[in-house]
Amino acid sequence: MNKEQRLKELTDMQYYVTQENGTEPPFRNEFDEHFEEGIYVDIVSGKPLFSSLDKYNSGCGWPAFTKPIQKEEVTEHFDTSHGMRRVEVRSKEADSHLGHVFPDGPSELGGLRYCINSASLRFVAKEDLEKEGYGQFLSLFK
């Protein structure tokens, strides 16, 4: 399925967040309080982005991660929208808006907080990794 077809399958919120650089409501989203073992992939491209092993409760109202699974799968861009100075995070392949990265994460884990919109992600549970084509990430959970 090509990107155009995948975009047609997104919900209104998923499209707003990933394609229009939107932000979903804090604390009222799918993955803020979700801590099952597995990985989070780009809702548009399916590329692996984050692991539950790097997720933590930052209290910000959105899923927070200390790092991406593979740094090369995300891009960072200086963002001055809404009168703020911050760093936007996008998926490399689909160019989906994911959220922002801030330098206030746990210092013992690198000091970064990837604050990511749930609407930009799809969760793949550890037990489904092999069947969904992400078997190479099973080793993360051993």
From Swiss-Prot:
Active site location? C115 (nucleophile)
Query: What EC identifiers does the entry list?
Result: 1.8.4.12
Catalysed reaction(s) here are:
L-methionyl-[protein] + [thioredoxin]-disulfide + H2O = L-methionyl-(R)-S-oxide-[protein] + [thioredoxin]-dithiol
- Which of UniProt's keywords are assigned here? Oxidoreductase
Q: What range(s) does the MsrB domain occupy?
A: 3-126
Annotated InterPro entries: Met_Sox_Rdtase_MsrB, Met_Sox_Rdtase_MsrB_dom, Mss4-like_sf
Enzymatic class: oxidoreductase
Q: Which domain of life is it from?
A: Bacteria
Record has DNA-binding as a keyword: no
List the record's Gene Ontology CC terms alphabetically.
cytoplasm
Which Gene Ontology biological process is one annotated for this entry?
protein repair
- Entry GO MF terms: peptide-methionine (R)-S-oxide reductase activity
Q: Which residues cross the membrane?
A: none
Which HAMAP family does the record match to this protein?
MsrB (MF_01400)
- So what family is this one in? Belongs to the MsrB Met sulfoxide reductase family.
Q: Which PANTHER family match?
A: METHIONINE SULFOXIDE REDUCTASE, PEPTIDE METHIONINE SULFOXIDE REDUCTASE MSRA_MSRB
Q: What is this protein called?
A: Peptide methionine sulfoxide reductase MsrB
Species: Lysinibacillus sphaericus (strain C3-41)
| Gene giving rise to this polypeptide | msrB
